[in-house]
Amino acid sequence: INYGKNRRTGVDFSLGYNDKVGDFEYGIQAFGQTNSSKNLKVAENVENDYMRTEGRLIDALWGYECLGYYNSQEEIDNDKVKSSFGTVKPGDLRYKDQNGDNVIDSKDRVVIGRWSAKFTGGMNLTLKYKNFTLFAMLTGQFGGNAIKNDTYNWVYGERKYSDVVLGAWTENKYKNGESITYPRLTTQSGDNNFNTSDYWMYSTDRIDLSRVQLTYDFSKSLFGDNALVKGLQVYVNGSSLLTIAGERKQMERNVGSAPQTRSFTIGAKVEF
């Protein structure tokens, strides 16, 4: 028997304004949409209310709540909470025991974020003066999250090392008060550290200068009535020119598929 009920809501909008002052024309358009989803009824049997998906986002991001690092063997020995992911060593991640059973396992996963953006949108700007036209497009998204769980960030076993390991935990770094941005390195599977948790979560908020184009239209008067060419337009444009984001490198790198690329085009449109 299939049992379930969910709701998806959102708002789309588009606003524009155009005006002309002498030889100068301009236009601006803003557009966007909001996105929300919720599980209204779910057939589930869970031990604790925090584990319920009913009443939560459909695209909720579930994971462990990280409390930092274990910085010594003494901390590990004195901690009543044990990991079900194998032997824990200094430099490993420490998680919150949500249900108080002194074991870190799948029952300790909670909602730590959401996969999809709450809002996506953008803006178009067109400026025209005599024969020149400048067009620019900004796009953006806000309110979503993702996990750094690709091979660039999850380095263990025989995987190739990336520059993220430069911030790996070591005893000397800890004692010297140096910045630590990565768990200890291991030649094993690292099951404890490489789980979906808020330690690896990042915001996918971004603003992109998606496209800019400059166009010049040659005057029709340059072409006679009997000319083969009736009109000529030349242009230069660029795509994916700029990304503003806290995790710009992570998103542009796009590990596992083609990285984000920038392109430039010079062209002409001929009317016969």
Where would I find each of the regions flagged by the language model?
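Conserved small-residue
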Residues: 2-7, 18-115
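Extracellular/periplasm-exposed beta-strand and loop segments of Gram-negative cell-envelope proteins
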Residues: 1-6, 43, 55, 108-114, ...
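Transmembrane beta-barrel architecture of outer-membrane proteins
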Residues: 5-11, 32-38, 117-121, 140-142, ...
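Membrane-embedded beta-strand positions of outer-membrane beta-barrel proteins
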Residues: 13-15, 28-30, 136, 234-236, ...
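Extracytoplasmic gating/loop element in the C-terminal half of outer-membrane beta-barrel translocons
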Residues: 141-233, 238
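C-terminal beta-signal and terminal closure region of outer-membrane beta-barrel proteins
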Residues: 3-8, 50-75, 168, 176-178, ...
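Repeated loop/turn-to-beta-strand initiation elements of outer-membrane beta-barrel proteins
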Residues: 23-24, 131-135, 221-222
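Transmembrane beta-strands of outer-membrane beta-barrel pores
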Residues: 17-19, 32-38, 129-131, 140-144, ...
